[in-house]
């Protein structure tokens, strides 16, 4: 009965609320939500390093109610979170699809899943966000199988006919189909945090975790992290649930550990 009136994502949310309220009524704690569409607790587009004014882009989309964006850059740089924030600014539902949701081992099934995703977004008036879109938009000139070409063709066809807001994100800009790139109204590069953004996020998270503000030594350490992203802060906050962070020094150390597993951390960062 619920599913007859709601789309798949709204149905899941309604069921979660129903189960949670039932658990509370029975004297248990509420169901912990793991909503993948939820924004980080600390979110501000000013703390996203992009090559355009993200707030201005959002304002333009609010007015136009239509647009096709390609967000590219390193993992954790804030691409998916920006799509979530855009949906909030537009006041529309968010429909997130990942490559694993759309890819199928059966011939022709991936194309059907792509068409279904756009149809679902159209019916719900939702912003459609497809993550890892490079899985479907590889340059057709290098295709070795017919289905690789047909998947790109289906994605392009659906993009052309979709009148809402479509956001695609990828970590791999190289090798994307040139015709596909031309279909996007705007291509936005996301990058590692600038030093001023890293310091701002550090201050916000110290406040959110009930910690004292960072001292100059800790500020200097955070400013030297060249591969720091908002995703690193989010990972450390998740760690805090089972590995409590008790000081700004510990927070910076945890962020340094996140960056240490990445490549290219041996160059200095300055205020840009």
Language-model features: where?
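AAA+ P-loop ATPase motor domain of ring mechanoenzymes
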Residues: 1-139, 147-272
């Amino acid at each position: 009965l619920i599913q007859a009136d709601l789309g798949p994502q709204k149905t899941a949310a309604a069921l979660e609320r129903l189960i949670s309220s039932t658990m509370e009524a029975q004297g248990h704690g509420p169901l912990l939500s793991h909503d993948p569409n939820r924004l980080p607790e600390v979110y501000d587009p000013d703390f996203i390093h992009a090559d355009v004014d993200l707030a201005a882009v959002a304002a333009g989309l609010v007015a136009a109610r239509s647009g096709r964006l390609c967000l590219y850059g390193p993992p954790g740089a804030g691409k998916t979170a920006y799509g979530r924030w855009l949906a909030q600014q537009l006041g529309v539902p968010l429909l997130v699809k990942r490559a694993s949701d759309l890819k199928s081992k059966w011939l022709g099934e991936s194309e059907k899943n792509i068409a279904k995703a756009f149809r679902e977004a159209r019916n719900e008036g939702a912003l459609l966000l497809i993550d890892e879109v490079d899985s479907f938009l590889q340059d057709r000139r290098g295709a070795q199988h017919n289905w690789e070409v047909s998947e790109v063709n289906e994605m392009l066809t659906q993009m052309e006919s979709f009148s809402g807001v479509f956001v695609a994100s990828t970590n791999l800009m190289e090798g994307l189909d040139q015709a596909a790139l031309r279909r996007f109204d705007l291509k936005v590069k996301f990058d590692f945090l600038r030093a001023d953004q890293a310091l701002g996020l550090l201050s916000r998270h110290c406040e959110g975790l009930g910690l004292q503000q960072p001292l100059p030594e800790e500020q200097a350490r955070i400013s030297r992290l060249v591969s720091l992203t908002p995703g690193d802060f989010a990972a450390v906050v998740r760690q805090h649930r089972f590995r409590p962070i008790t000081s700004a020094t510990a927070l910076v150390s945890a962020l340094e550990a996140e960056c240490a597993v990445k490549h290219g951390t041996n160059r200095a960062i300055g205020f840009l």
